[in-house]
Amino acid sequence: MAAATSSSPISLTAKPSSKSPLPISRFSLPFSLTPQKPSSRLHRPLAISAVLNSPVNVAPEKTDKIKTFISRYAPDEPRKGADILVEALERQGVETVFAYPGGASMEIHQALTRSSTIRNVLPRHEQGGVFAAEGYARSSGKPGICIATSGPGATNLVSGLADAMLDSVPLVAITGQVPRRMIGTDAFQETPIVEVTRSITKHNYLVMDVDDIPRIVQEAFFLATSGRPGPVLVDVPKDIQQQLAIPNWDQPMRLPGYMSRLPQPPEVSQLGQIVRLISESKRPVLYVGGGSLNSSEELGRFVELTGIPVASTLMGLGSYPCNDELSLQMLGMHGTVYANYAVEHSDLLLAFGVRFDDRVTGKLEAFASRAKIVHIDIDSAEIGKNKTPHVSVCGDVKLALQGMNKVLENRAEELKLDFGVWRSELSEQKQKFPLSFKTFGEAIPPQYAIQVLDELTQGKAIISTGVGQHQMWAAQFYKYRKPRQWLSSSGLGAMGFGLPAAIGASVANPDAIVVDIDGDGSFIMNVQELATIRVENLPVKILLLNNQHLGMVMQWEDRFYKANRAHTYLGDPARENEIFPNMLQFAGACGIPAARVTKKEELREAIQTMLDTPGPYLLDVICPHQEHVLPMIPSGGTFKDVITEGDGRTKY
């Protein structure tokens, strides 16, 4: 039987399995049992959008690395489906997986023990595993691999898959499934994970023939890393894992509906039109997002040639150095005043690798209302989805920038671009509305803690975060110099992301300084991953900004709900004068050094100690809960609604 997939553009026609057919009800599967008669279900098309990473082993033809692969099996030697699956991962260059075993996936784990090249980093929860795989992928550009068992193991991956889908992160998730004969019978630990994840994966597969494993794995990696990166799920029934077979590694991929829609290189005429608009403008601004992360060199050259200031989305941080004089840092709801001012007053908005999401635009009709808009993105579905551009290019931002840079270099004398007056105007805004914070006695402003960390690491650390106030402060006050330094759940906003993401980043970058800047609410959601950090001896540093509250929700309570507290206090109401829970004891239980700091004057030394201590370390920084993330444009608001003053000490 052919492998079942979730998307109609991919061919379902294949030779029937040579293995003994099993009596499976046609009502129990999310696809038609007759290849010539596809299911009448509506299928979601495969998404293609802004590139985040260079494709890794994704060319349709075999690469030299795959050609020279040496198998530990003789070519005609039968082996289990699980061993075929693991070897398929090896052939894709996989060196690390984040896998938690269970009844329906233990065959895969047994096969992993027979691999001499793949390391399994054992998370303490499947959500920790998928977030760690994301951290690995986001920090390295390579696809992250996570493995879970059927039922609750698979459903525990859902938040991570949705997160990777929204942020365009290349993931391959492999799940065990109940044996084929039990599918649809409500068997123990059975969930229809293909159906569950249909709308939060770029594509997914239910493997129904052991012979299809080599092709499916190759396709999964190609889909995850080409076009718009994203998560792909491969669901493998246990009897498929146990079945003996001789793999055919030369099977071609069958992705006609996908391959035909991959964007072509941008046309010279389109790029020339954009250069003409630049030459005619007086107040241009760059608006760059996650789709520009793989184009930082080309973007830097473009800015050098044009002198156009750069504003970044949360996902785009690091694509252009935040400490450069032409950087406006982040725009949007909690972006800098000067970045939002630039967009508000621009006459040309160059939107590269972005999707005009609500946290950036606020009220769509008012966003960049005076500007001509140029939108370059590799996903045709994103162009015109929220904001209609005057000029659009559906293609790779990297190729578009390379092409425009050539045009600009060839026409430099003719164009003589000079936006000095505009840059001076924006410099005045920087002087007038800098990112700032207030100090109250000995209390530690959370912004100051991040500022000190930036100074002591010289802006070279890889930073992961949870979600909330600390996330926004980390985006504002740490100056990212390069892409892939900033790892954060941007589109989904998943709390609990920071700690496991730091694990993945540390595994992918063993020589890097990796710091999880976290809040007490987010941190405790995946606190069990401290055990993984200790067992794997990963030098992850945790800068915990602890205010005993759900800070961002509390900020909205202060501003819009008359400070009425609705379950945002995370401490013990019976012991409000004590820090609860004691995060140091969590660290101590896992054998991780930890310390607490409560006074501003002691903070710098405490952070330096954290950085100097070999291995992992947790620093519990006690912060006042009254702090607000500013600037702030209320949801659905415009630049005119920007809030720059106040905190929880004021009544509104």
From Swiss-Prot:
It comes from Brassica napus. The keyword Transferase applies. Pathway: Amino-acid biosynthesis; L-isoleucine biosynthesis; L-isoleucine from 2-oxobutanoate: step 1/4; Amino-acid biosynthesis; L-valine biosynthesis; L-valine from pyruvate: step 1/4. It is found in: Plastid, Chloroplast. Belongs to the TPP enzyme family. Keywords: Amino-acid biosynthesis, Branched-chain amino acid biosynthesis, Chloroplast, FAD, Flavoprotein, Herbicide resistance, Magnesium, Metal-binding, Plastid, Thiamine pyrophosphate, Transferase, Transit peptide. This is Acetolactate synthase 3, chloroplastic. Binds 1 Mg(2+) ion per subunit. Coiled coil: none annotated. FAD binds at residues 228, 334-355, 377-396. The lineage of its organism: Eukaryota, Viridiplantae, Streptophyta, Embryophyta, Tracheophyta. Mg(2+) binds at D520, N547. GO terms for biological process: isoleucine biosynthetic process; L-valine biosynthetic process; response to herbicide. Its EC number is 2.2.1.6. Thiamine diphosphate binds at E126.
